[in-house]
């Protein structure tokens, strides 16, 4: 499991760097590997070796990635362009923290004590102006991301803010479709058809495999 926020590169970075493959990134980095080597364990002092990497993957998917997606859809709806702008909004910051705590409650029990500190650290990381992490980049391919970032969380435990995040994606899809903007999503055509259907919310849930959660998400 690798955790390091890395926005898409820009023309400015390409021009200013001698490295043609340069990308922006943050100072923070976390690398977790399962201690399951055929040969002796490598001497990598910055790597965390664990028996099971899955809980760390869940923490990243449900808390970091989930919060990013929520900020993307809710932030774009408020007119923001970047993560640092959206997280500076008091309402979105509060809801994002609530989402993190909801998601954290669904993690394996031995990970839950870490959630408050992890969430607070993420809020600080999201406020990094220098990253200039675009919300529309995070919003791409929502049909592929939501099942892991939100739906699995909801199946693991009730979460009203996580459900709100799914509704934010639905509204994003509706607005983009109504305004004639092409969605950057491998299921863009299915999403557009769902938005124009007689029951768009249920149809959108069907696109992402979440129809079983309709009562929880839609209320």
Feature-to-residue mapping (PLM):
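Substrate/ligand-engaging "lid" and interaction regions
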Residues: 1-219
């Amino acid at each position: 499991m690798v955790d390091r926020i890395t926005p898409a590169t820009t023309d400015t970075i390409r021009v200013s760097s001698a490295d043609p493959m340069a990308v922006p990134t943050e100072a923070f980095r976390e690398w977790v590997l399962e201690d399951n080597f055929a040969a002796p364990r490598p001497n990598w002092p910055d790597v965390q070796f664990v028996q099971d990497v899955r809980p760390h993957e869940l923490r990243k998917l449900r808390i970091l990635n989930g919060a990013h997606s929520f900020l993307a859809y809710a932030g774009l709806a408020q007119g923001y362009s970047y993560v640092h702008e959206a997280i500076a909004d008091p309402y979105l910051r509060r809801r994002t923290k609530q989402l993190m705590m909801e998601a954290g409650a669904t993690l394996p029990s031995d990970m839950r004590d870490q959630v408050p500190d992890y969430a607070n650290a993420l809020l600080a990381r999201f406020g990094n102006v220098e990253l200039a992490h675009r919300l529309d980049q995070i919003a791409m391919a929502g049909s592929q991301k939501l099942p892991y970032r939100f739906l699995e969380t909801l199946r693991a435990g009730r979460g009203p803010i996580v459900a709100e995040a799914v509704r934010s994606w639905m509204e994003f899809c509706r607005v983009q479709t109504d305004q004639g903007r092409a969605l950057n999503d491998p299921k863009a055509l299915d999403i557009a058809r769902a938005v124009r259907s007689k029951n768009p919310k249920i149809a959108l849930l069907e696109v992402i495999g979440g129809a079983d959660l309709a009562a929880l998400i839609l209320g």
